[in-house]
Curated annotation (Swiss-Prot):
Keywords: Mitochondrion, Transit peptide. Residues 1-72 form a transit peptide. This is Altered inheritance of mitochondria protein 18, mitochondrial. GO terms for molecular function: intramolecular lyase activity. The keyword Amino-acid biosynthesis does not apply. Belongs to the AIM18/AIM46 family. InterPro entries: Chalcone_isomerase, Chalcone_isomerase_3-sand, Chalcone_isomerase_sf. GO terms for cellular component: mitochondrion. It comes from Saccharomyces cerevisiae (strain YJM789). It is found in: Mitochondrion.
Amino acid sequence: MDRGRCANMLKSLQRTLAKCQKSPSTKHWQCFKRNFTSIRATKYPGRSNSTFHYWPWFAASTLLATSLYYRDRPVQNDDKTDAFPSHTESIQVDSSVSDFPLTITALNFPVSTTFKLLGYGQRHVTFLRFKVYALGLYLAENDENLVSDTLNETYLHKYFLDVDDSKTPKENLARLLKRDDSKSVMMIDDLLDSGMRMLAKITPVRNTDFKHLKEGLVKTISKHPDVANNKDTLAKGLSELNDAFSRKGSVRKNDDLIIELLANGALQFSYHDSKNNEFEVMGVVNNQLVGKFLFSQYLCGEKSPSPQAKKTAIDKLITLL
């Protein structure tokens, strides 16, 4: 076989491998194996007529080794968000932005404590179905015990009548968190009232501006089911949010908005310019309803801005019960 045909076969193999890396379906891997078997059997005369050089076999072997590396690599794609790789330091939330760290500390972000990733997903604009930002929800490492301290057997029997006695308290609590929107709101709100510290990392997947980010936060907060009972207090809180979020201008794709829920219920906003790796603390909202309603919406209810992030976060919370 001549060099040109061998080169074309290798290019075909590379294209198939690229598809495998992007979408590791059974069909793509079967195609890769067929191409690999074909090219492995190929040989052609090298520069010396006295011997044969099996360079296609070696090249294909190299590609195969590379493919196995990527196939086994714990990279998370946009549609599979049900696992937290234990042996990596970050996870892919959306392929168009940088991976999200599994741990956020004061060494790399302007935060008050160490946070561990709780859940993650994307925010879509409903009527157009395009992605707006990647979202990571984090729980303070030292506050993990508050989950089981708050949502325990005593809590279950005190506030809920529809307890299935054939199931364990943990199974009953998990069922309420996952399947009953109204009760999950109550449970999450009680968790937040316990002083549980959280953090949200918002990373735009397209260029935007601070105005749009602020408007998105206000809309999310305003969808909490208890807004009607707290109009006056919340109005003051949203005024604080407007002052804390006074920065204007553009926010580039892959920059970060960091929202930290402090132990006293206040919210601290920080901005990360990823291109220059610069941080700015934008402001603080002391009104406790703003932070409570925002993170409650992230974690529960019918109108969460990212159902994907809500699901992964609730699944992780259940493991802490």
